[in-house]
Amino acid sequence: MILHLRFVCSLKFLFPFFLLFGAMACRTTETERNVFRENPKKNLGTDSKYELEDGLYAVHYGNGRRLELSDESEDGTERKETVFLFYLIKSGNRILLIDSGISSVRTKDRYGLKDWASPSTILEKAGIRGSMVTDIVLTHFSADHAGGLDLFPRARVFINPNDWELLKKTDWFPNLRKILHTKEKDKKLTFVQGSLEVFPDFRILFTGGRTPGHSAVEWLRFPKNRVLFAGDECIFTELCAGGKDPAGLPLYSVKNHREFIQYLELLVEQGTKILTFHDPSLLRPEEEVFPRIYRIP
């Protein structure tokens, strides 16, 4: 959820919305050009008890409160369960996370997460140590998305500069400012403004609805298999696909958010799979390959 936006909503500057269709290409090495090319014929599950195979996975690190949904066309109010997720892409020696979860017990307690497990504990059971994570895309600065960054010291971080500055003002985990400074000093930080193709067919999109620097990620896994990681611009996939979103959640820019939802609707019509970070319907028991780790077909 958007866990820390009271002071964001009071900001007086307006961050301009970049057109989602205007991607700015990033030069990459030849090694990077093939790093996220999946083989659609390969079984992306795992036959090993101790090792996660190449593929896309949702990591479920906690449960949240019921989110109240209101619809003016209906009587009464509906409440939907929420979960807390981040995503992992494994391709050979490259392990990329989209968001990082929450590492701090104090932060977890502050925001009332239930059935919480540290992201590092979950990943280690699948044979992934924190030092093995090579890249992290942060969709925005909120605790449940950026609050586990300290667990992955070697990872290069991709984030919008506005949300990086907001992240510096938080206390999501111990020694936060020192850790962020180390990322800057070690040049393990890439700022993303507008749209940026980080790897071939894998681009970060500025959305700017929930927070000033909110981003989404669009990835063409292979022909006819495109996914969109929506961050917190969309909470429940089915609602957003129909042009709706839970009322009452804080927004930095209503205009930007609505434009993104319209774009999302278009992608759904074209067959794109929408992945959100709080929708329990994305977790299928038969796809749980390790405890709390779910394969995304």
Residue ranges and their predicted role:
Residues 1-9:
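N-terminal secretory signal peptides that target proteins for export/translocation
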Residues 24-25:
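C-terminal motif of bacterial Sec signal peptides marking the signal peptidase cleavage site
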Residues 32-78, 196, 217, 290-292:
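Basic, amphipathic N-terminal segments that precede the first structured/catalytic domain
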Residues 39-47, 103, 117-128, 132, 161-206, 212-288, ...:
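Metallo-beta-lactamase
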Residues 63-121, 216-233:
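Conserved beta-strand hairpin/beta-sheet module of binuclear metal-dependent hydrolase folds
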Residues 89, 99, 133, 140, ...:
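Divalent metal-coordination and catalytic microenvironments
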Residues 95, 102-187, 236, 295:
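Active-site HxH/HxHxD metal-binding segment of metal-dependent hydrolases
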